[in-house]
Amino acid sequence: MKQRLLVMNGQKLLQTEHAGEWKVDKVEKAGTIRPGIYNLYLAAPADQATEHVGVVLHADSQFVYQQVGKTFIRHDRTRFDQVPTLGAHVSIRYQHDQAMVAAATLKVGRKLSH
């Protein structure tokens, strides 16, 4: 089953593909999630040895989806004590098989040119 998020006009639409057509399953306020099309079905399972820094896009009964750069990561929801806030820019790492969530620090810098 393919799922995607369509974010536009302040709304977040969860869509599922049925027989080649996208059907809307759920509509919610987008909050701080940027407008765009997010193909959740392309999400790779989280690597527990890596720290994942990015925006939390969606959470369902099984997974928490996070955008890391241009890729999507899915975290097993049962590994969280509390699901992170949707739209939040967070760092997720694993310790003793549990997901640890912390506010991500944005890296701001400038390149020097000669």
Residue ranges and their predicted role:
Residues G69-L86:
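Beta-strand/loop nucleic-acid-binding surfaces
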Residues L57-F63, Q67-F72:
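Short, flexible beta-strand-to-coil junctions
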Residues G31-S61, H89-Y94:
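Structural detector for short beta-strands of small beta-barrel domains
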Residues L5-L6, G54-H58, Q82:
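Short, exposed beta-strand/loop patches in secreted or surface proteins that constitute
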Residues V7-A43:
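A general sequence property marking short-to-moderate contiguous segments
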Residues K12-L13, F63-V64, A99-V101:
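Hydrophobic residues embedded in beta-strands of well-ordered beta-sheets
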Residues Y65-Q66, L106-H114:
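Non-Sec secretion/translocation targeting segments of pathogen effectors
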Residues R4, N9, P84-T105:
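Flexible glycine-rich surface loops and low-complexity tracts that mediate binding to linear polymers
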